[in-house]
Structure formats: C-alpha cells, structure tokens
Amino acid sequence: LGRNQGPCLRHFHGPWLCPAAFGLRRRLPKAKAIASEGPIEIFQDDTFFNCENGRMKLRAFSEGKGELIFYRRANQRGPKESFYVLSPTSSPGTLREALSQAYGQAGRVEKHRTLFIVGRTRVHLDQVKNLGHFLELEVVLQEGESPEAGVQEAHKLMAKLGVEQSQLIDGAYVDLLSQRGLHAQNAGCPE
C-alpha cells in the first residue's frame, strides 16, 4: 500500500488501543463491515537494530520473505507522521544475523496481525507476544497532504469502530516491551 509513491513514503500513525479497555473481538465485525479488503492474516517477526538516525527493523514473514525498514517518527505522544524506506529481502534470517553483528539488536516484536483496508487506511488488529492485543490505524498520506488530514480521517474511523479518545495509549510495541523489561532475548513465537 502506497509503494508506488517512490522510495520514501509517508504514513500517519494513529492511536494504539488496549483490548482490556475496548474489547477487540467486538471491533472485528465492525472492521469487516467497513473494509474494502480483509481480513488478511499475517505473522510478523520484527527485529529492531541500534540506529542513531531513526529506527531500523527487519520484518520477517512466515513464508520466509522479509523487509528491511528504516523509518523516522517523532517520539511524541499521540498521532504522528512517519517517513520510511522499505527494502525487500528473500533471506531475512541471514540479514538479521549480519545486522545483529554489525549494529546490535535493540528489541524484537513478534505478532499475529489481522489486516483490514478501509479506504487509504490500514486497520491492524494485532496479537503481540508478551504484550497482548491492540488495534492500530495507519493512514497513507498523499504527497503534500498535511498530517492533520490523517488525524481527521483516523478520528472518523475511530467513531465508526466505537473507539473513544480515553482508550488510546502511546508507544511502539518495541518500546512497550522494553518498558516491561522484555527485550530481544525474551521474544518467542506466538502460541
């Protein structure tokens, strides 16, 4: 999604939601009802590497393929804009080993993702190993479009899904795991 926009892409990353507060299973039928695509089931194993200029992660998929993703996103509360570059790989295991030796691992996140496409928004229903269930909204911004347009679109979608502002939490999964003292060596495959 959005790969035809050139090597550097812009996304608006919306809020994260905690299932204990909002009932993830109740959101699934609502997401299905408004989606043009999905559900698409994806297993993702993300290894984050030490990187001074942003974040770099290797995303391995269950079918043996992967993507090296470098991105920059502000460390601020609430919705944020993200700039990133993707590079596909057919050898994620070997690439993980090389990057781990060169840069060191900063964390690892393993998740089962159920993806829905609603217009230009990716709706992620995630089951994250050692963390729980979450919902994330990711709005693809067009060239020259303001982040505020992404915020407005995310808020409209939140209303359709029955999500309230009080149910939002901040932070990337790797940061939430780190806050709990769970780092790369504690990661395992989902059951």
Q: Which residues fall in each region the model found?
A:
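N-terminal strand-loop-strand beta-hairpin
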Residues: 1-10, 14-120, 161-191
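Glyoxalase I/VOC metalloenzyme domain signal
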Residues: 2, 27-30, 135, 152-156
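Short capping loops/turns at secondary-structure boundaries
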Residues: 20, 88, 127-130, 143-151
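A short, polar/proline- and glycine-enriched secondary-structure boundary/capping micro-motif
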Residues: 77-83, 135-136, 146-148
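Residues forming well-ordered secondary-structure scaffolds
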Residues: 94, 111, 132, 149-156
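Conserved, surface-exposed functional patches that form binding/active-site neighborhoods
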Residues: 105, 110-143
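Mixed-charge, glycine-accented linear interaction segment located at domain edges/termini
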Residues: 145-169
